[in-house]
């Protein structure tokens, strides 16, 4: 085994396997942009009424997972967990204290769906840091 391969092998043993697109994975709560069906900012999740678009995607999309930002308070996303449970969609609370993301909830598919529009672009979104 060459020295470069040995070094790579040792690094992966100590730090884990290499990760593809780490910045993208940090933004989308562990998923990739190509798999995102819908993404809500933290501010949108804090809205008193859940988005109908989120319920529509949870109800009608197949093989998706609801990813929730662990920095949020439970009461802000509990209605989304209830929706996911109602439609048999698994959910994960992602708590990565090392990286911060402006997103609060991501509905992600198991495979690439390549949706062009993944954000609900309302007033709350327009005030967020994601606005282009």
UniProtKB/Swiss-Prot annotation:
InterPro entries found in the cross-reference section: DUF1694 (IPR012543), Ribosomal_eL30-like_sf (IPR029064)
Origin: domain of life: Bacteria
Membrane-crossing residue ranges in chain numbering: none
Pfam families: DUF1694
SUPFAM superfamilies in alphabetical order: YueI-like
Protein name: Uncharacterized protein YueI
Organism: Bacillus subtilis (strain 168)
